[in-house]
Structure formats: structure tokens, C-alpha cells
Swiss-Prot record:
The protein, known as: Queuine tRNA-ribosyltransferase accessory subunit 2
Needed cofactors: Zn(2+)
Functional note: Non-catalytic subunit of the queuine tRNA-ribosyltransferase (TGT) that catalyzes the base-exchange of a guanine (G) residue with queuine (Q) at position 34 (anticodon wobble position) in tRNAs with GU(N) anticodons (tRNA-Asp, -Asn, -His and -Tyr), resulting in the hypermodified nucleoside queuosine (7-(((4,5-cis-dihydroxy-2-cyclopenten-1-yl)amino)methyl)-7-deazaguanosine).
List of residues binding Zn(2+): 325, 327, 330, 356
Cofactor mode of binding and number, as noted: Binds 1 zinc ion per subunit.
GO biological process, one term: tRNA-guanine transglycosylation
Amino acid sequence: MKFAIESISKNSGRLGQLRIKDGGPELKTPLLLQTTKGGSIPWLSADVFESHVSQKPQVLQFTLSTMDQMTEALTHWNSGGGNGLSGYVGLPGHLNILMVRDPCETTLSGGNDRDIMPLFTRRGKESLSSERYMEMVASFKPDIYQGLCDADTNLDSAKKRIQKSVDRTEKFMHYIYEHRCKVNSTLLAPIVGGYNTFARTQSIKHAREQPAGSYGGYIFEGFHTNGLTATTLDTSKLLPIVEHCVKQLEEDKPRILPGAYTPLTILELIRQGIDVFDSSYAYCASLNFKALTFSFVQDAVEHVPFLDITDEAIKEDFTPPLSECSCLTCQKHTRAYLHHLYKTNELLGPILLMVHNIHHYMAFFEEIRESVAKDALPQLTELVRNQNGKTQVDYSIAANNKVISKATMGKGFAAAAV
């Protein structure tokens, strides 16, 4: 994996180019990973995604917690000359990164042991050791994979829990650094330590002590427990820790921060020097019946961050979900129709919502890259912060409780998981 910086600005972060493998496409950073569940982009078939969302190669974010049951099948697939991990899930031509936890769902706390990390899957809790993890990575053969780490920390974690997370991560990574040569994939060094600057420094020091070429980038973990918790983070606590960490890292390696961070938080993190994020925020919005409507184009109109499709007020609103949007959903359908699909539990409902939300979020990142190139990120941040209003907009996502009836729900919309 090769990473080159095009420009760095004190006010707008940095613009870069990322080439994950030789012969692969050059990707502009700040970059958006496409979050998947069980190897698929939620609710979207490969044909729908590639026909109506993006015709360009993307980086797919696979998670072990939703794909661990595929290990044996992937071993046979790759040994038989299969077309890689992306090809196995029906998305050939796209790059991929393998992570441990699903950023879309709240990760349960506890279950930590000295030599294993708990992996919460559909079948319950599995025990994951460093040895087992590397065996699974060898079976998956991803383009990039994160190092195994104890990320069971958040803002409320005690110092003892934070220190244990750092110590256990160092132990996991000691084995992984020794055996990484057996896997032809790029390793990301995990940086853990909760909201403790001393612990974060210790984690960074351990990574930077490794021989040159041991890893290709950094992944920050342990700020939240995934799912909707990432949308409610206190940035006044988060940003100083990120700034503290970034100052200690070399500039020629990408920095990844997974989680459903809000658009405003993402802009502030980009200014701090973070390069790669994921689309779990768009999924969380779709799961909770919200269409993203925040504006990132300068105009004189006041905007709102979401359209709640459960709202009875839109049942006779025959305008597009977002009038300026060019996605399939907004070009072909109306707010009233989305509300009707919600009320009738139709599978098409979440499909159309996800098409719009992913399209809108990808366009947002296009605008981010243009703003960074022009050193105009502060202006974009101000627009996203207030949406041309007088007060700061709230981008946090609350679990939607207006489910009609769990007993009668079909395979479309599902009850939102907290």
C-alpha cells in the first residue's frame, strides 16, 4: 500500500492519494469506505449498487463479526483460484479492508480475557486469539486488515480498563507483527487507549518501535462502542485526543477512524489529519427511517439534517426527498411514496433510502475533497454546522421507536438496534 500527500493545510487537513495494491486505482483521500454486513452493502444488491450508486471502484469495509462463518468457504475459494474476497461476495473489481467489529451495531462490553478477545457474532460470543485471528486473515486474504486490539473502552472507562486495553493490544500485536509475513496483505497498526493521552502515547510508541514496513497505516479504536453511540460523541473530548495522537504519527501513513461519526464531526476530524472514514452513518440513518438532507453546497436556504419518513406530515408530500439530489430515489420517487413504503413494510423502502443516503454521503465526500484542495474546509464546516440557520444543527441519530408492529414487520425495515 502506497500513500502520498498532495497538500497539507493547517485549516483544512490534508489531501492525499492512496494506492492499495500495485495496478489498482489511485484513491483520493479523505476517503469513504463502503460499510458492509455479511459481505453485502445493506439492502443493496451488487447490481443496484454498481448501476445506481457508483460506477467507480470502491473500498469495501468487511467485518469479521458479520463474516466469520465464511472462513472455511473462503479457504476453499482462495485455494481454488477464486477472485479474492471481493469476488467471493459478488463485488469483483472493488478493493477491501477487513476489520474486526461491525461499526453499525453497538458492541457488547466485557468478556475480555488475558489471551483472547471476544467476537460477538450472529451465533453469540466467540473467543478470538491472535493465532486464530491470523488463521482467519490468511483464509480471507483481504487487501488490508487491522491488527487485533482490545477496543472495549469509551469516555466512561476507568483508568484500569484503559491500561488493560493497551497492554492486551500490545500482546496481541506482538504475535501479529511476528507472523504478518505469512499473509500477503497490508496491516493497519491499532492505536488504543480510550480518552487517556498517556495510554494513547504508549500505544503509539509500541507501534512505532516496530521495524520499517511492519504496517502500512494506523487505525484508531476505543473511542466508542460502535452503532449509534458514535453519533453522540462529545467532540470537545474527542478532538484533543485525536490531535494529541496525530502529532506523534509520521505523515506518510494513512489514518483510519471507523464509526458512525456525524458529518460535522468528520469535518473536524479531517482538519485534525484523519484520512479515512466509513459509511456506517448512512446505514444508521437508513435503519432509523431517516433520509439525509443536510446541505454541503453554499446557498441562502435553511436546511435540516434529516427527513423522517415516518412523519405523518409527508404522507401527501409529492416532492422528492431532496430536490437537488440526482440519485435514483430522488429522481423517480416522492416523500409520500417513501412514507407509504414504511407504513406497508415494503422491502423497497430501505432499498430506496439506502440508495439515497449512500449517494448523498459519497457526494458529501467529493465536496470535502474539493474544499480541502481549495483550503476551504472551514467554510464547509460552518455550512454543515448551522445549515444557514442561527443555531448548530443536531446530527445525532436516536433509535426510532415508531415501529408499527414488530410482529407484522416483513423483511424490509427492521426494528432499529440500539
